[in-house]
From Swiss-Prot:
The keyword 4Fe-4S does not apply. It is found in: Secreted. Its main location: secreted. The cysteine framework is I (CC-C-C). Alpha4/7 pattern. One of its GO terms (cellular component) is extracellular region. Keywords: Disulfide bond, Secreted, Toxin. This is Conotoxin pc1b. Disulfide bonds join 3-9, 4-17. It comes from the Eukaryota. One of its GO terms (molecular function) is toxin activity. Expressed by the venom duct.
Amino acid sequence: DECCAIPLCAKIFPGRCP
C-alpha cells in the first residue's frame, strides 16, 4: 500500500510491505 512507498512508514509497519 502507500505506506510501503514511505521508508519511515515501512519501518514502523514492516509487515505491510512484502
